[in-house]
Amino acid sequence: MIIVESGPLEEMKAHVVTTFPDECCGFLYGAEQTNGSRMISTILKVNNSKTGDKKRRFEISGKDYMLAEKFALENNILLLGIYHSHPNHPAIPSEHDRVAALPYFSYVILSATPGMIDHIRSWKLNDETQFEEEAFSPTHLNQSI
């Protein structure tokens, strides 16, 4: 299970709003609990460095990955995953998302339409490099932003 504290959750939602209709992205930081769940306490927004159609794809630069690792070390916090938006599409990873995914990370996807976050879901790669959904708290938002 992945649990996102209210502050980081609001930051992610605001990031989606300000970049809509393009995809946005960022890093998820926090702690792993003894029961295996992940508590997200901090996010780090990054620019979508994708050239071309940012409405359907996102890309995080190598430099941003290095800065993300540095941020984790400097703040004594774990880098646990990545979030990104799916404007006008479901919160289900695409094949492009799967190919670009790294093991261990949680991938939180925010499905958005104009002025609304429809769903937030989280995914992790299994041993066969396929996405499996992980429980997310909360799972349905259906609230205006």
Annotated model-derived regions:
Residues 1-79, 88-145:
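Conserved beta-strand-loop surface patch within small alpha/beta domains used
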Residues 85:
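Residue-level "edge-of-site" marker
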